[in-house]
């Protein structure tokens, strides 16, 4: 019995240790990431586009995917100067971005509704950027027989303005980039929507020649492997890397080092490809009814990673007609309900770990409660009460078992004094006593065993849900996704654990008793590193457990 109980305690300690390593790494990364956002924001400028060139311009160290019919084994790499005098600025209620007219790439994208730091609300979070510190951009173009992007470079588009703003009262903003081919007029159209992070991309091809225009659309995410957390900390951290859905698996993650070893090529009808980081992501979502070729790989000559799709079926535009090719690009927070509507399985980029089947319903419940009360802290408290109701009867059975254990504690002490030198005889007598008094010595472990998966799932849910990022509670707690700045909640949690121990029977094994006495102190130190939202759950859960256990214990004592 003692062996099983010690194994349980050891398992809890191990899980807690792994969780604290994870959370500590995340905190360190969050600080470093913030510094990067500040640097990026300060280096950004608004500049007007230059006069368009009739000839394609070679991109700066970029790679353009081959058309599906190409015999080339590798994409072509280019080198050229990247000027800052050819950019246009676009602003909506949710996005603040810069498009380079050379290729029509998104080279910077900030999220005005999300702050880099809680106390600096004038400094928006920067998701995409291209500077001396890091490279993370979204590219798209046309490849194939008549494509504008290829071995000879990329097109220089023209725009009607250098600044575009979504005006009050309007729900959409359309930005057209123009390029004149020898026998076609190419319009690259970006459509932005109010209260949305999803960008519609459409290529309009007006064939002014006397032969068919043939080409394929590609979309690509280009990023280096800069990891804001690599300078400090050890252990696990929130996932940073590529993600894709394939016919074989709904969600496949690939770290940078995996892509460096071997590229991934897959064909799929519809699908998506994404670059995932903590709280935020960007993803290309092509036409869900057409076949696409996806390639995820590392550049041959630079420390760059490319996640691309290319339409497998070429678009043919007859002379004197206009054709179009469409795709969508998402860049923003990982809102589960939003991602569910964009494409199948895109919501899996919210990494709830292996207990996702528990964490996901927990978030839906938490989100529903938040819609009623308007405060995430109160929602966590009410969710805790609901969870406690679910475990009410198993907990009651366990507390009755522990109350009976307290009742037979004097008899157990007598057996210990009588057979202390004969452990085998003492164990046999204890089993007889348990059977006679109808006591289950492991009954008190049941609530912990049942709640640990919920506790771990709740941890991941709080850690991965962008809705809790910078979400305030009351008084000194301004962000439930980070640790309590004054450690008030962890101290309260430690006190509740100590009170719970007083209600439980003292273990017969002296060593085990000492370990149990140290548990409140250990967990108090441990929970100082946990997010305040998670500690709040544990405090409320312990308080409700103490109340239930106290009532049951008194009822059994009065019955005697």
Swiss-Prot record:
It is a multi-pass membrane protein. NCBIfam families: PRK01318.1-3 (NF002352), yidC_nterm (TIGR03593), yidC_oxa1_cterm (TIGR03592). It holds the Pfam family YidC_periplas. It comes from the Bacteria. Required for the insertion and/or proper folding and/or complex formation of integral membrane proteins into the membrane. Involved in integration of membrane proteins that insert both dependently and independently of the Sec translocase complex, as well as at least some lipoproteins. Aids folding of multispanning membrane proteins. It comes from Teredinibacter turnerae (strain ATCC 39867 / T7901). Gene3D superfamilies: 2.70.98.90. GO terms for cellular component: plasma membrane. Belongs to the OXA1/ALB3/YidC family. Type 1 subfamily. The chain crosses the membrane at residues 1-21, 303-325, 349-369, 372-392, 442-462, 473-493, 520-540. Residues 34-45 have a biased composition (Polar residues). Keywords: Cell inner membrane, Cell membrane, Chaperone, Membrane, Protein transport, Transmembrane, Transmembrane helix, Transport. One of its GO terms (biological process) is protein insertion into membrane. It is found in: Cell inner membrane. The keyword Magnesium does not apply. Residues 34-74 are annotated as: Disordered. Its main location: membrane. Interacts with the Sec translocase complex via SecD. Specifically interacts with transmembrane segments of nascent integral membrane proteins during membrane integration. This is Membrane protein insertase YidC. GO terms for molecular function: membrane insertase activity.
């Amino acid at each position: 019995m003692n062996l099983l109980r010690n194994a349980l305690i050891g398992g809890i300690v191990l899980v807690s240790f792994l969780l604290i390593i994870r959370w500590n790494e995340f905190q360190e990364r969050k600080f470093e990431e913030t510094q990067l956002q500040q640097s990026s924001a300060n280096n950004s400028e608004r500049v007007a586009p230059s006069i368009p060139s009739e000839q394609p311009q070679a991109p700066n160290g970029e790679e353009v995917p081959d058309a599906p019919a190409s015999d080339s084994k590798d994409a072509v790499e280019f080198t050229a100067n990247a000027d800052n005098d050819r950019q246009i600025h676009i602003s909506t209620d949710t996005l603040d971005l810069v498009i380079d007219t050379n290729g029509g790439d998104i080279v910077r994208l900030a999220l005005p509704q999300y702050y880099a730091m809680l106390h600096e609300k004038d400094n928006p979070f920067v998701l995409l950027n291209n500077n001396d510190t890091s490279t993370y951009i979204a590219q798209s173009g046309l490849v194939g027989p008549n494509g504008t992007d290829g071995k000879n470079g990329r097109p220089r588009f023209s725009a009607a303005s250098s600044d575009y703003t979504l005006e009050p009262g309007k729900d959409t903003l359309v930005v057209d980039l123009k390029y004149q081919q020898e026998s076609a007029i190419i319009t690259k159209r970006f459509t932005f929507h109010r209260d949305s992070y999803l960008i519609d991309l459409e290529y309009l091809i007006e064939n002014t020649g006397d032969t068919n225009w043939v080409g394929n659309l590609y979309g690509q995410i280009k990023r280096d492997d800069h990891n804001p957390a690599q300078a400090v900390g050890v252990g696990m951290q929130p996932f940073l890397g590529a993600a894709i859905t394939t016919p074989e698996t709904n969600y496949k993650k690939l770290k940078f080092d995996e892509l460096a070893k071997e590229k991934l090529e897959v064909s799929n009808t519809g699908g998506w490809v994404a670059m995932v980081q903590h709280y935020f992501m960007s993803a290309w979502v092509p036409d869900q009814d057409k076949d696409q070729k996806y390639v995820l790989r590392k550049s041959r000559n630079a420390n760059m990673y490319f996640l691309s799709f290319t339409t497998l079926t070429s678009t043919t535009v007859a002379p004197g007609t206009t054709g179009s090719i469409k795709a969508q690009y998402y860049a923003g927070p990982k809102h589960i309900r939003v991602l569910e509507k964009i494409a199948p399985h895109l919501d899996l980029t919210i990494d709830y770990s292996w207990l996702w089947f528990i964490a996901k319903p927990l978030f839906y419940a938490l989100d529903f409660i938040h819609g009623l009360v308007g405060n995430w802290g109160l929602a966590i408290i009410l969710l805790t009460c609901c969870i406690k109701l679910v475990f009410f009867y198993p907990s009651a059975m366990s507390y009755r078992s522990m109350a009976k254990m307290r009742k037979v504690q004097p008899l157990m002490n007598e057996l210990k004094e009588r057979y202390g030198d004969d452990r085998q005889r003492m164990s046999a007598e204890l089993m007889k006593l348990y059977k006679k008094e109808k006591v289950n010595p492991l009954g008190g472990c049941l609530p912990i065993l049942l709640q640990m998966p919920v506790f771990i799932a709740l941890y991941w849910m709080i850690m991965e849900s962008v809705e809790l990022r910078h979400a305030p509670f009351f008084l000194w707690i301004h962000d439930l996704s980070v640790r309590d700045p004054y450690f008030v909640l962890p101290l309260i949690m430690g006190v509740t654990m100590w009170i719970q121990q007083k209600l439980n029977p003292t273990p017969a094994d002296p060593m085990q008793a000492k370990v149990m006495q140290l548990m409140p102190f250990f967990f108090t130190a441990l929970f100082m590193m946990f997010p305040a939202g998670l500690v709040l759950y544990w405090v409320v859960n312990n308080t409700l457990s103490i109340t239930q256990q106290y009532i049951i214990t008194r009822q059994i004592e009065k019955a005697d």
